[in-house]
Amino acid sequence: MKFILFALLVSAGSWYGWKQLHSQDAVSKPIRYVKIEGAFQYTNKETLKRILTPEMKRGFYHVDMDAIHQLISQLPLVAAVDVNRVWPDAVHIKITEQKPIVRWGDKAVLNKQGEVLIPDDIDEFKNLPLITGPEGQEKKLLEIMKGVYIVLKDKSMQLAEFHVNDRRAWRIKLASGLEMQLGRKAPLENMQRFLKTMDLLGEEQVAMMASVDTRYPNGYAVTWKPDTPEIDWKAIAENYKNVMKERRI
């Protein structure tokens, strides 16, 4: 069997297709056309061609639809497959891909349901937020991360990483590079306490922070970036007093 065409066809969605010459291997009516439909981001067309060619050689009447379905379903990041024989000489395949929304550890990604998926190339997803945590806690941690993401977004902050260690202590990292140690006890409250002080500190002071440790009952510890100029804490304290007076009024 010789392939004379395997090309991306322009139509609704994205289509891969190939045309085949008559095959002496096909005892019955040969398959001349295969169309594969889908909005492809991660599925490689050469991989599809390689795994489907042996089945297509079986001919129109003997090609195994279940086998094709299984072969494609086993590819990374394929969510659903629909395979149909189309008279007189074609097979149509529709592929729906998974939609990863975060990275999970070093080698996996999660979809919106919190299901673990193993892609061929994790580097394709380096721009997605990262979660690390105990195995089996993927769905729970994804839901927590969504909440943290929303809270930070309200403060014009972008969450880049969310880490939970074996002791269930939280640590997050923002797209700006700022790291926050939130601890194991009341981590959300710890984060909120820090965020409440941002308006008083001002954007310039927050931008100079390298990390914040919120695991203190009445405050937090700050590690400043190198070459941070001296901060006028007296002015900040005075500003705080004025803000509190205005709130009482």
Swiss-Prot record:
The keyword Nucleus does not apply. One of its GO terms (cellular component) is plasma membrane. InterPro entries: Cell_div_FtsQ/DivIB_C, FtsQ, FtsQ_C_sf, POTRA, POTRA_FtsQ_type. The keyword Transmembrane helix applies. Residues 1-6 are cytoplasmic. It comes from the Bacteria. GO terms for biological process: cell septum assembly; FtsZ-dependent cytokinesis. Its main location: membrane. It holds the Pfam family POTRA_1. Residues 24-249 are periplasmic. Part of a complex composed of FtsB, FtsL and FtsQ. Essential cell division protein. May link together the upstream cell division proteins, which are predominantly cytoplasmic, with the downstream cell division proteins, which are predominantly periplasmic. May control correct divisome assembly. This is Cell division protein FtsQ.
